[in-house]
């Protein structure tokens, strides 16, 4: 793999801190890139993601799909067009869906099944 196959990326977290920059193969999938981001997540940050489905990568206003490679995403957006330029991608965390549902059920009072209709 030559240098022309590598893309230099850094990842901007929601609080403004960065992961990287590092070089990645343009043939790497977005899903494996997310796994690397999770592995490099700063240890001092709260709410670190555990699964790739909790991470969204945004570049050029587009959310990158897990099954695409970086070279496929390059055709949709501008990634590393100029040599020596570091491309910044934004990292957005999405809490797992089942946690939201569990939290909502715990916070909501139990519903009573009686009618509140009034017929006049």
UniProtKB/Swiss-Prot annotation:
Leader peptide range in chain numbering: none
S-geranylgeranyl cysteine lipid modification positions: 117
Presence of the UniProt keyword Protease in the record: no
Lipid anchor positions (S-palmitoyl cysteine): 115
Top-level taxon: Eukaryota
Protein's cellular compartments: Cell membrane
Name of the gene this protein is made from: MUB5
Keywords: Cell membrane, Lipoprotein, Membrane, Methylation, Palmitate, Prenylation
Pfam family, one: Rad60-SLD_2
Domain Ubiquitin-like residue range list: 7-72
Name of the protein described by the UniProt record: Membrane-anchored ubiquitin-fold protein 5
């Amino acid at each position: 793999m030559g240098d022309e196959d590598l893309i230099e990326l850094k990842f901007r977290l929601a609080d403004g801190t960065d992961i990287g920059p590092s070089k990645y193969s343009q043939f790497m999938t977005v899903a494996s890139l997310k796994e690397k981001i999770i592995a490099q997540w700063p240890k001092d940050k709260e709410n670190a993601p555990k699964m790739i489905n909790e991470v969204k990568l945004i570049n050029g206003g587009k959310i990158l799909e897990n099954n695409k490679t970086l070279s496929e995403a390059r055709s949709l957006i501008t990634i590393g067009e100029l040599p020596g330029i570091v491309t910044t991608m934004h990292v957005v965390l999405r809490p797992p869906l089942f946690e939201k549902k569990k939290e909502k059920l715990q916070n909501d009072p139990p519903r009573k099944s009686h009618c509140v209709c009034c017929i006049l």
